[in-house]
Amino acid sequence: MKDLFLFSDLIYHNHLFVYAFHFCLVAIIVVLVAKLATSKMQLVPRGLQNIVEAYLEGVISMGRDTLGSEALARKYLPLVATIGFVVFFSNAIGIIPGFESPTSSLNLTLTLALIVFFYYHFEGIKKNGFFKYFGHFMGPSKALAPLMFPVEIISHLSRIVSLSFRLFGNIKGDDLFLLVMLTLAPWFAPLPAYALLTLMAVLQTFIFMMLTYVYLAGAVAIEEH
């Protein structure tokens, strides 16, 4: 958003630097939140510890409902919770004037999508074995294998596009919406828009986390079918 002031431009004015700078800022925020929440842990959680614990319990509950197993939900908690933190703060930081959302760059959303893609395939192969895992792609009948296998491959590859472009498109659209609102009425119009953009930041985070659990569930639950 070239028409808006960005703090990163005070250091270096470059399109790629803007997103790299803000992603590093998000990474620092995530580390600080984790550090502050665990530095003085109490039996009865308060403050930031209480918020983070509630968030983690929510992630576990989401995983338990999706995977059907609390053990698996806790196993994948570090991945899903970290992705949730990164995506949320990346979405939310762009709402603050002078900052840009790292998730409005396809570079970050595609990277996150590829991490999820390769990890759930890795977990599927690890649990079921290489041949059994990819044999599932061929469908229930050998006669349908020549048709089902390429369809399944395309279906899985499309998940990369779905994960990355959904997040990128929504956040980029939010940034452009905010730009228009700030241009038309910089003092009054953005106030209700900020509430809407915050809601969208939370919603897109939830969708990305939920889909991560769904893809993991499909990969590790093959032997149960």
Swiss-Prot record:
It is found in: Cell inner membrane. Gene3D superfamilies: ATP synthase, F0 complex, subunit A. Keywords: ATP synthesis, Cell inner membrane, Cell membrane, CF(0), Hydrogen ion transport, Ion transport, Membrane, Transmembrane, Transmembrane helix, Transport. GO terms for cellular component: plasma membrane; proton-transporting ATP synthase complex. Signal peptide: none annotated. It holds the Pfam family ATP-synt_A. PROSITE patterns: ATPASE_A (PS00449). It is a multi-pass membrane protein. The keyword Transmembrane helix applies. The chain crosses the membrane at residues 16-36, 79-99, 105-125, 176-196, 202-222. One of its GO terms (molecular function) is proton-transporting ATP synthase activity, rotational mechanism. One of its GO terms (biological process) is proton motive force-driven plasma membrane ATP synthesis. Belongs to the ATPase A chain family. Key component of the proton channel; it plays a direct role in the translocation of protons across the membrane. F-type ATPases have 2 components, CF(1) - the catalytic core - and CF(0) - the membrane proton channel. CF(1) has five subunits: alpha(3), beta(3), gamma(1), delta(1), epsilon(1). CF(0) has three main subunits: a(1), b(2) and c(9-12). The alpha and beta chains form an alternating ring which encloses part of the gamma chain. CF(1) is attached to CF(0) by a central stalk formed by the gamma and epsilon chains, while a peripheral stalk is formed by the delta and b chains. HAMAP family: ATP_synth_a_bact. This is ATP synthase subunit a. It comes from Campylobacter curvus (strain 525.92). The gene is atpB.
